[in-house]
């Protein structure tokens, strides 16, 4: 069933194509026309029906005229092959034809020629002169390279050299270009503004040198090559008088950079391990010392002590540096490295002396001519701490002796007592006095390894507010603190080194530091209790609480938790002989200042005020 001529024209119009073509073309045109005529696409329903009818009719007609070849090797293919070749052998393909002879031609041997003529002699191969020998050691001889240069030498004929001179100068806007004659040929010495490949220069010149020889080289040693070219005959150059020697060796001012060592020394002197804090502190040095307002601040005497011209000049460079954080990170790493070296090489007594020397320097700043604090306020805090325990000076002295000697299984002080009895205050003061870190032992076991990593290179540690599972007070929350401590027997004993780790750092093997364990009234496991060398129980005293509340000068400024306050407690209550020889001079000096500025009578009055819950400073 074939399409009539009218139906054929109608189908062409609906498909919008000049010719239907084969089945594949018909199908593509039909799918495209469906998007136009389909009612869902906004087309005419009648036109779509008519298109579908005519398409199906045309597809049947096309398939009827298309023969399909059966699969090779099957019986159907054998039958098709016989039908296809039927009658082929009977056809006579012979053609009776006689060729007329061509004009009489004499067979001439190859290369024969008419008498009297002469063959054109073959052209001799053109030879290009070698590149000037005197320049070879200063140019690159690489055949294929992507390296870029800003200095080139072109070697070509005398005529092409004159032609290339203005062409190159216009194309590359050369800083310098000169044309020389060398043994009858041209040498072009070129310095461009930017860098280019040798083949780019060669491609430009080859457009002018289709027949003439051309050699382009990148120059490795521009000054030496120019000096050799100056021995040739000069034809032209774009700079009158040529290039001065200073062109190749310009006098450059030495670029000043940030002195990293100076920043590291500053970080070590203030023992800063926080990169962001160090960055802020060092940027304060950008102002000249004589105009610095920070130096006039009585609370910033450490800044005044370090603010010198060297730091000011370096801080100005540091201010414009793009690597501020990197510099500060390295400086803080230097502080940590020095601390680790001290922990490995110094005795614990020497480490404590260093710590206390820093505290004495801080006391000079606080109570000196520029300081804002009053020694009497600190001594009020000392008398309050002394009232916490009947033998507080002896407790502190024995604790310091214990952490300095650091004997195995004789390394920890247990502070136990009810809520709000002063355990945390004592622990914080001793950390300020000796240096150390706080550890949260109540965390889950999987986090415990990184928590213990805080003890790396520390003098002492505090296991703060350790929780247990049983207690005499039902109101206390239970926890796994003592269970975790029980699993850290090697850490508490201090007999063998243990592995400590922090995130993004390698493990460190060291003896775990001694320290303090504070807890409320929990039942302590026996295996933990026997590892507590000193045990101190504190009691809640309402008058202590009341006197502290009435004396804002002491509680508001956190004097009770300051290492300086605890050092003053030892200075006042212990004899000079209890201190090492390096510190005895400072101890004598501060004993005299306490006697002069406060006096025993006022201190006795402070003690009575504390016992009565009054303002400690009231006379």
Curated annotation (Swiss-Prot):
Motif range (Nuclear localization signal): 121-128
PROSITE patterns xref list: DNAJ_2, SF3_HELICASE_1, T_AG_OBD, ZF_LTAG_D1
DNA-binding region: 132-245
Positions with biased composition (Polar residues): 110-120
Binding site for ATP: 417-424
Disulfide bond found in the keyword field: no
Keyword field: ATP-binding, DNA replication, DNA-binding, Early protein, G1/S host cell cycle checkpoint dysregulation by virus, Helicase, Host nucleus, Host-virus interaction, Hydrolase, Inhibition of host innate immune response by virus, Inhibition of host interferon signaling pathway by virus, Inhibition of host JAK1 by virus, Interferon antiviral system evasion, Isomerase, Metal-binding, Modulation of host cell cycle by virus, Nucleotide-binding, Oncogene, Phosphoprotein, Viral immunoevasion, Zinc, Zinc-finger
Cofactor binding note from Swiss-Prot or TrEMBL: DNA helicase activity requires Mg(2+).
Modified residues (Phosphothreonine): 120
Name of the featured protein: Large T antigen
Natural source organism: Bovine polyomavirus (BPyV)
Phylogenetic classification of the source organism: Viruses, Monodnaviria, Shotokuvirae, Cossaviricota, Papovaviricetes
